[in-house]
Regions:
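Generic enzyme active-site microenvironment
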Residues: 26, 166-167
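Short glycine-rich, flexible loops that bind phosphorylated cofactors or substrates
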Residues: 89, 113, 135-136
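Acidic, divalent-metal-coordinating active-site segment for phosphoryl/phosphodiester hydrolysis
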Residues: 170-173
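Conserved N-terminal beta1-alpha1 strand-loop-helix module at the mouth
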Residues: 1-79, 87-89, 96-104, 117-124, ...
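ABC family nucleotide-binding domain
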Residues: 112, 133, 152-155
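Short gly/ser/thr-rich secondary-structure transition/capping motifs
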Residues: 107-111
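Predominantly soluble domains enriched in secretory-pathway, periplasmic, or organellar proteins
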Residues: 94-96, 112
Length: 173
């Protein structure tokens, strides 16, 4: 995630990621409402997207993702992840993302059961499990999340699906 980058040297940090073998740039976006923290806005995300040819994932930890999907798509995100907890209309979110020509993903807070998204897993390209208190960098991985990853892998296999599984938080070396 570029959340841990030095924003005064964003281009250098992204280049270092590429040279280190990264193939996805993860962009954490918070709004101070959905989570009690502000990270970066659209301008920084757009600059980061322009700075690389890596796949760009926009992780929208925001209260009204439907208001920003098109903006982050236009900024250069390839995969847009909305939080399950931020909407009661996940199929609409997926539709908005697809209409923007992008891949769609859903993110889950640590306390949210995996089964709560089972009814729409067939419609997403990725599921991101947040493995720390959502919205803040520099935290320790929640060990209990291992079981959640295993549950998601089993559910994907049971349903014969092929979505990507991502984890976010507490994974820096």
């Amino acid at each position: 995630s570029i959340l841990s980058a030095d924003f005064l040297r964003l281009q250098e940090e992204i280049t270092r990621m590429e040279q280190g073998g990264c193939d996805v740039l993860h962009i954490d976006v918070t709004d101070g409402h959905f989570v009690p923290n502000l990270t970066m806005g659209l301008c920084v995300a757009e600059a980061a997207c322009r700075a690389t040819k890596m796949r760009k994932d926009a992780h929208l930890m925001i209260s009204r993702p439907q208001d920003f999907i098109k903006k982050f798509a236009d900024a250069g995100a390839d995969l847009i992840l909305f939080h399950h907890e931020a909407t009661s209309h996940p199929f609409e979110m997926i539709k908005y993302i697809r209409e923007s020509g992008k891949m769609a993903g859903v993110a889950l807070d640590p306390a949210t059961p995996v089964r709560s998204i089972a009814h729409y897993l067939h419609a997403v390209d990725a599921v991101l499990l947040v493995t720390v208190c959502v919205g803040f960098g520099g935290q320790t991985y929640i060990d209990e999340m291992d079981a959640k990853v295993e549950e998601l892998v089993s559910l994907r296999r049971e349903k014969g699906l092929h979505f990507e599984i991502q984890v976010d938080g507490g994974l820096t070396p």
